């Protein structure tokens, strides 16, 4: 099926099969469609609502065309990632949580990009911290193996995305591609915490990841709108484990953490996000730093559980608390800065 045939189906509110979606996505991602066709396709899909079959097909093609990262093992390797688009403009929680997971003994294959709608994307934050991002796949793999955390810059590993960049930017709306980023980790991780911008996506995306071979995944959305675990409200979870998807909710009090507002955690730049994270992972001199530390723990703990390094969310949160409060997480951030500095010089030659 070509994109014209797909558009004809979509405007009549007819779904595509997985195979049909794969055919259309290959055309888009290999430069065989016009910007007008891509924009119409994305808007049509959004208005119709994407099915699990369609998302599976789109993800499969993006993974196929990605510049992958080969790791010696995927055991205990996890990604903490969100779709973004929650409008909260709080600091980069998932990036900070990645260093806590590494400090607790996990391996993090972090996949991310620059900000699209927010003030600071994961790439913006890490660049502000002095972490070199233009790494080869082999260099990322060494970061993960040696430091315990490596960052895969989406625009480096998904070069075919350039064909959809213009239409996405001009539309200025959430589209299918907002869902695809967290599902197309170049290392092929099978353990993830995926934050989404609406609760309606939790179970469908867990089902998508199940079909694509994931093993232990938490797809989450907080009742206050965050695409991650929140301190201010209950968090809805669709958990994929042992081949089954179940849904439930948790609150901070379930883990001995006090519910509180997120006031003071908003940032207006990558530098502001970095300063708050350094305080949270360090001595926590400010009230905002103390609150940020609790939010980081609330998100790092589930990642340790998804990585099967903890037998429960409660145990994962305790492990994350210990790793943050020993200062090891702050050391992991500094270690990644130093480790990637070598590659900055190497790649410049």
UniProtKB/Swiss-Prot annotation:
The metabolic or biological pathway listed in the UniProt record of this protein is: Amino-acid biosynthesis; L-tryptophan biosynthesis; L-tryptophan from chorismate: step 2/5
- Record's Pfam families? Glycos_trans_3N, Glycos_transf_3
Can you list the GO cellular component terms from the UniProt entry? cytosol
Which reaction does this chain catalyze? N-(5-phospho-beta-D-ribosyl)anthranilate + diphosphate = 5-phospho-alpha-D-ribose 1-diphosphate + anthranilate
GO terms for MF? anthranilate phosphoribosyltransferase activity; magnesium ion binding
Tell me yes or no: is Flavoprotein among this UniProt entry's keywords: no
- Which cofactors are reported in the record for this sequence? Mg(2+)
SUPFAM superfamilies (UniProt xref)? Nucleoside phosphorylase/phosphoribosyltransferase catalytic domain, Nucleoside phosphorylase/phosphoribosyltransferase N-terminal domain
Amino-acid positions noted as binding anthranilate 2 in the UniProt annotation, renumbered to this chain: 168
The record, for InterPro entries, names: Anthranilate_Pribosyl_Tfrase, Glycosyl_Trfase_fam3, Glycosyl_Trfase_fam3_N_dom, Glycosyl_Trfase_fam3_N_dom_sf, Nuc_phospho_transferase
Tell me which residues bind Mg(2+) 2. Answer: 227-228
Decide whether keyword Magnesium is in the record: yes
Q: Which residues bind Mg(2+) 1?
A: 94, 228
Q: What is its EC number?
A: 2.4.2.18
One of the GO biological process terms: L-tryptophan biosynthetic process
**Cofactor note text:** Binds 2 magnesium ions per monomer.
Print the keywords alphabetically: Amino-acid biosynthesis, Aromatic amino acid biosynthesis, Glycosyltransferase, Magnesium, Metal-binding, Transferase, Tryptophan biosynthesis
Which superkingdom does the taxonomy of this entry point to? Bacteria
Q: Which residues bind anthranilate 1?
A: 82, 113
Q: Which residues bind 5-phospho-alpha-D-ribose 1-diphosphate?
A: 82, 85-86, 92-95, 110-118, 122
What quaternary arrangement does the UniProt entry report?
Homodimer.
- Which family does the entry's similarity section mention? Belongs to the anthranilate phosphoribosyltransferase family.
* General function of this protein: Catalyzes the transfer of the phosphoribosyl group of 5-phosphorylribose-1-pyrophosphate (PRPP) to anthranilate to yield N-(5'-phosphoribosyl)-anthranilate (PRA).
Give the protein name, as stated in the record: Anthranilate phosphoribosyltransferase
Gene that encodes it: trpD
């Amino acid at each position: 099926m070509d994109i014209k045939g797909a558009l004809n189906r979509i405007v009549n509110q007819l779904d595509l099969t997985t195979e049909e979606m794969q055919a259309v996505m290959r055309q888009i991602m290999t430069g065989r469609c016009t910007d007008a066709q891509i924009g119409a396709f994305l808007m049509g899909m959004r208005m119709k609502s994407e099915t699990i079959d369609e998302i599976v097909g789109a993800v499969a093609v993006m993974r196929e065309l990605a510049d992958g990262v080969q790791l010696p093992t995927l055991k205990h390797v996890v990604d903490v990632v969100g779709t973004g688009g929650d409008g909260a403009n709080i600091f980069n929680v998932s990036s900070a949580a990645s260093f806590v997971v590494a400090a607790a003994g996990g391996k993090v294959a972090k996949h991310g990009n620059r900000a699209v709608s927010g003030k600071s994307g994961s790439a913006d934050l890490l660049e502000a911290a002095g972490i070199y991002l233009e790494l080869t796949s082999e260099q990322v793999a060494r970061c993960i193996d040696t430091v315990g955390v490596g960052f895969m810059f989406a625009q480096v590993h998904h070069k075919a995305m350039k064909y959809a960049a213009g239409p996405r930017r001009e539309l200025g709306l959430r589209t299918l591609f907002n869902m695809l980023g967290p599902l197309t980790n170049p290392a092929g991780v099978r353990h993830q915490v995926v934050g989404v911008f609406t609760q309606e996506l939790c179970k469908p995306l867990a089902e998508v990841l199940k079909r694509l071979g994931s093993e232990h995944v938490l797809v989450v959305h907080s009742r206050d709108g965050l695409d991650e675990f929140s301190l201010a409200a209950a968090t809805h979870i669709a958990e994929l484990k042992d081949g089954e998807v179940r849904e439930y909710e948790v609150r901070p009090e379930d883990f001995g953490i006090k519910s509180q507002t997120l006031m003071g955690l908003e940032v207006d730049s990558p530098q502001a996000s970095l300063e708050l994270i350094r305080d949270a992972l360090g001595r926590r001199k400010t009230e905002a730093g103390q609150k940020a530390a609790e939010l980081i723990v609330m998100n790092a703990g589930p990642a340790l559980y998804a990585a099967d390094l903890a037998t429960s969310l409660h145990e994962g949160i305790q492990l994350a608390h210990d790793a943050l409060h020993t200062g090891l997480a702050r050391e992991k951030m500094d270690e990644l800065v130093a480790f990637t500095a070598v590659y900055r010089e190497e790649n410049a030659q």
